[in-house]
Amino acid sequence: MPIKIPENLPAAEVLREENIFIMTEERAAHQDIRPLEIVILNLMPNKIVTETQLLRLLGNTPLQINVVLLRMVSHSHKNVSQEYLDTFYKSFDQISHRKFDGLIITGAPVETLDFEQVDYWEELKEVMDWSKKNVFSTLHICWGAQAGLYYHYGINKYHVSKKIFGVFEHSVSCEDSPLVRGFDDTFWVPHSRHTQIKREDIEPIKELMILSESKKAGVYLVERKDGRQVFVTGHPEYDPEVLKKEYYRDLKKGMDIDIPVNYFPHDDPEKRPVVRWRSHAYILFNNWLNYYVYQQTPYNLDNIDQAIL
């Protein structure tokens, strides 16, 4: 089944070219199905790129999904016009009265700041607090995962001496969770961050469970045991060229940056990157939508309060 998004959203044309089914609102209205209601809090600077990455993964399921794009009004956006935001994005005030099956909180290029120094931190806290009673399951990505763990559980992030940058091998730490069904024994995920969370800070918290780790990139996948919160420290949604663009961007700035590991053939930036993580990304998002959203959320979203008690 398809995702339902605004007809003129730029990401829609890209997804159509990739043969991903986009449904118009008119056609969706004729299907006697309650679609999943998913809100994406997009904190990344390049809105269109991130929209496309996430919608691509959400569109590869047998479920009909209505997508709402959410922005932080307390942040001044430099890489997208106000007209674009007004056309395609909602403010929290516009959606706070609603309930949703799922929420995705993206990463953001603010990890070197203390959480309280981020200009939209107070607004983000409001969204995360609201999600506890109005969203059935929330998927946090990269800095979004760090922010969620810090806000909900007091788990802080730590700076690393060398940027964790490249595509890293991971393994499953707990096979009991539905979220890791279908994962290979070892699988690959992109990471691009200057900070990390630590296993020893997570283990004492009885509500949380570490599902996957990497020897070199650290803790990757954490969930609340009831599936209502999922924390992903990497970027499984990344397009093939993202790390390449980040590498050349940092070089242009004169930064001391290493070639992303396990990415370019023979570590040659002139060669086309090797994509090792695509199938893992699809499985992860499919599992989250199927096991933690579709199969668990009540048919009537107004009953979410009772379902999550």
UniProtKB/Swiss-Prot annotation:
The pathway that the record names for this protein is:
Amino-acid biosynthesis; L-methionine biosynthesis via de novo pathway; O-acetyl-L-homoserine from L-homoserine: step 1/1
Q: Reaction catalysed by this chain? A: L-homoserine + acetyl-CoA = O-acetyl-L-homoserine + CoA
Q: Name one GO molecular function term.
A: homoserine O-acetyltransferase activity
Query: What is the top EC class of this enzyme, as a single word?
Result: transferase
InterPro entries associated with the record: Class_I_gatase-like, HST_MetA, MetA_family
**Per the record, where is site Important for substrate specificity?**
192
**Enzyme Commission (EC) number:** 2.3.1.31
Q: Name one GO biological process term.
A: L-methionine biosynthetic process from homoserine via O-succinyl-L-homoserine and cystathionine
What is annotated as the active site?
142, 235, 237
Source taxon at top rank: Bacteria
Its keywords, alphabetically, are: Acyltransferase, Amino-acid biosynthesis, Cytoplasm, Methionine biosynthesis, Transferase
Q: What residues does substrate bind to?
A: 163, 192, 249
CDD domains with a match to the protein in the record: GATase1_HTS
What are the site positions for Important for acyl-CoA specificity?
A: 111
| Single GO cellular component term | cytoplasm
Location in the cell reads: Cytoplasm
Q: Which family does it belong to?
A: Belongs to the MetA family.
| Described purpose of this protein according to its UniProt entry | Transfers an acetyl group from acetyl-CoA to L-homoserine, forming acetyl-L-homoserine.
HAMAP family tied to this protein: MetA_acyltransf (MF_00295)
Protein name from the UniProt record: Homoserine O-acetyltransferase
What is the phylogenetic placement of the source species in the record?
Answer: Bacteria, Thermotogati, Thermotogota, Thermotogae, Petrotogales
The gene from which this protein is expressed is metAA
